[in-house]
Structure formats: structure tokens, C-alpha cells
Amino acid sequence: MKELYIKQKLLSLSGRFTVKDADERDVYIVEGSFMKIPKVYTIKDEREAEVARITKRVLTWMPKFTVAVAGEEVITIKKEFSFFKPRYTIDALGLEVTGDWWGMDFEVYQHGEFIGDVKKKWFTWGDSYQVRVNDESQENLIISLVVAMIV
């Protein structure tokens, strides 16, 4: 099982942060568009090749994101109205997310098979997450899903 770590900077206007492996090497670079509508986050690999694009839809009642992996739109994430805990609806072929989304502690399944999980690290400077990927062929998908939920 591969472990990756996401650490968001506390005060970053551009929304740029990295995803590192267990040896603290940059595996992915996430860059947000600054002052652009719609807001777009691009996920690139260590060779600067784009692996996914997250777009925040405009003119929606609640936040809505679409995730394109390898140029194909594969996930739509909609934040639902809720007073206390954030609630999301995820539309993706065969993808299911279970657990505590509010505490960012959840598991990801595809067609009933476990492919990864996410755990938020508390008491850190900025937001930090541990992402474990069970099926490495789905790594880009899992990282894209997590980034869409935390931005």
C-alpha cells in the first residue's frame, strides 16, 4: 500500500501545495488558478505533466466541483446544505466514499473493492492529510478526489 501526504499551506493565495511520498519527495503538484472564474485546480506529476483538473462550477447554490482525470470528466462532487457537518454527494461510476467526511477520515471503494483511505492529521501547521492508496492504478483518481474535497 502506497502512502502519500498532502500539506496545505496556511496562507497561500494561489492555492499551490504538493503531495509527497513517504520519503518526502514531491509526487504531485497542485496549483490553483488565482483570481480566475471558474476556479480551476491542476494536478501535475513530478514531470509537470497534467494528470487531473478540478473545476469549481459557478452559479450554483452550493459548491460543485467536476474532476477530470486524463482529460475525461469522471467525478462530480456537490456540497449539500447542512447546519453542522459538511455533507457531499459524489457522482462517479462505481465510486463510493464511506466514513467521516467532516473529520476527513474516510475510505474509498470502487465497485465494492477497497482502493484507498484518507486521514486528516490534527494539530499541525496548516492542514495535513495521509492518503493510503491500495490500488496504484487508481492513485490519480484518489488524489483528485481528496484535493477536490479539501480545496
Which residues does each PLM region occupy?
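Intrinsically disordered, low-complexity proline/glycine-rich segments
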Residues: 1-151
